[in-house]
């Protein structure tokens, strides 16, 4: 699951993950609706909600489908995991560039190109007859993964500062709904054929593109200075190098290392659980779709309801410890489960842990960042999350292929419990007064 922005935001409403910032093209000269200054901000937010909802449905629909489809083409567990790794890697490398283009050219063309790329990537998936074609489709999808960051910029453009949190909550609500609807839709469409979900999402993405084309105005402020070549060069520097340059103190380094632990472990679950339950229990794409839809429901309810109540009674460090223990125990227990039905219980435990720990941990991290570096360091936490999504699947796939089907989940659980031990040992450094 994606990273939540912090406990304070979670008390309001579930906030969106940070994602790619966005592509654009001067060649896209379609007549735009009226400028943002004359546009109704609420109407723009409705379009953004629909755009992000369909975009996340397209992302999450693949969770129960792609691993089994790739395996049917002869892919090994490592090759299946590589499909997720390539997507995350392409997103990590190109997101800053699309962000630069978004600031220079505008939000609308960036979103349109991103959505068109989504249609193309799903059509490539639908016609794929080899693992090489699957790789190409996932690299394309990662390259064009620009909608979320640009949507955040649109919300910033059309809302006042005092309404910003509610505006961002629109993206969070779309994300949560998409993570529930996507796996369920993928599982249901798979009953019509293994490729039916790809065609279905391509149609949805095309409808999404038509909606944005006709209803989304340009929102980039007219007086906003365009970034120059230096900003582009900086964007082209790989994120890990910028990350190393930004970390000067042990406290920040510890936080970022723990972010890496959290998202590496969870990425193993997303990447490989479909193969595991399919091989051991004969679970179908529909079965796995329902499982992940259930996990999405529990995650959303945890962050929208339970977290608010727990935050009144427990401090952030206690919430982090509880969440890490739940995730670690739930992941490590997966290989011991005797039947597929038990995965719904374990999935709920993992989702509750994730929904509690990530916002609380992000909130602690934000308090550790000095005001003048908060934006960059919060962005670097997202980079560590994406790096975890790159490393986790490929390492988990190697463990599944070389050791046993359950080995990746034992390792992921151990990694989460190691993060808990490190957090408790370093609590005096990590949990300190706000700077």
Features from the language model and the residues they span:
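Helix-breaking motifs and short loop linkers at transmembrane-helix boundaries and internal kinks
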Residues: 74, 106, 127-132, 282, ...
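Cytoplasmic helix-loop-helix junction between adjacent transmembrane helices
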Residues: 137-176
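Conserved MFS/SLC helix-loop-helix module at the cytosolic interface between two early adjacent transmembrane helices
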Residues: 92-129
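Juxtamembrane intracellular "pre-TM" segments in multi-pass secondary transporters
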Residues: 31-41, 217-256
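Helix-to-loop junctions at the C-terminal end of transmembrane segments
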Residues: 95-106, 302-315, 400
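C-terminal transmembrane helical hairpin of 12-TM major facilitator-type secondary transporters
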Residues: 317-361
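Helix-loop-helix hairpin linking two adjacent transmembrane segments in secondary transporters
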Residues: 171-214
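Short amphipathic helix-loop junctions that connect adjacent transmembrane helices
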Residues: 64-77, 271-287
């Amino acid at each position: 699951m994606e990273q939540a922005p912090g406990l304070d935001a979670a008390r309001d409403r579930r906030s969106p993950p940070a994602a790619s910032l966005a592509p654009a093209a001067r060649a896209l000269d379609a007549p735009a609706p009226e400028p943002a200054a004359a546009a109704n901000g609420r109407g723009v937010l409705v379009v953004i909600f629909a755009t992000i909802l369909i975009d996340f449905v397209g992302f999450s629909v693949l969770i129960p489908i792609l691993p089994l489809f790739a395996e049917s083409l002869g892919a090994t567990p490592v090759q299946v995991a590589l499909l997720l790794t390539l997507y995350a890697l392409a997103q990590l490398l190109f997101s800053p560039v699309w962000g630069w283009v978004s600031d220079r050219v505008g939000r609308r063309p960036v979103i349109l190109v991103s959505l068109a790329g989504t249609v193309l990537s799903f059509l490539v998936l639908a016609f794929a007859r080899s693992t090489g074609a699957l790789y190409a489709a996932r690299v394309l999808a990662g390259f064009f993964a620009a909608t979320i960051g640009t949507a955040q910029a649109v919300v910033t453009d059309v809302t006042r500062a005092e309404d910003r949190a509610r505006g961002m909550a629109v993206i969070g609500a779309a994300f949560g709904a998409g993570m529930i609807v996507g796996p369920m839709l993928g599982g249901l469409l798979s009953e019509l054929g293994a490729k039916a979900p790809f065609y279905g999402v391509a149609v949805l993405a095309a409808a999404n593109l038509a909606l944005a084309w006709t209803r989304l105005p340009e929102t980039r402020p007219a007086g906003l200075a365009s970034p120059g070549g230096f900003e582009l060069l900086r964007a082209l520097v790989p994120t890990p190098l910028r990350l190393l340059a930004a970390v000067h103190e042990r406290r920040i380094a510890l936080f970022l290392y723990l972010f890496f632990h959290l998202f590496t472990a969870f990425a193993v679950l997303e990447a490989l659980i479909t193969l595991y339950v399919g091989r051991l229990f004969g679970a179908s794409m529909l079965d796995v779709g329902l499982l992940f839809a259930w996990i999405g429901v529990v995650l959303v309810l945890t962050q929208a309801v339970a977290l608010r109540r727990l935050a009144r009674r427990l401090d952030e460090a206690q919430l982090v410890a509880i969440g890490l223990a739940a995730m670690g125990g739930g992941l490590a227990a997966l290989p011991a489960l005797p039947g597929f039905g038990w995965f719904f219980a374990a999935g709920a435990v993992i989702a509750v842990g994730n929904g509690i720990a990530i916002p609380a941990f992000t909130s602690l991290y934000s308090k550790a960042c000095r005001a003048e570096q908060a934006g960059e360091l919060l962005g670097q936490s997202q980079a560590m999350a994406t790096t975890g999504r790159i490393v986790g699947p490929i390492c988990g796939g190697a463990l599944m292929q070389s050791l046993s089907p359950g080995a990746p989940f034992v390792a992921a659980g151990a990694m989460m419990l190691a993060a808990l031990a490190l957090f408790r040992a370093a609590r005096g450094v990590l949990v300190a007064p706000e700077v």
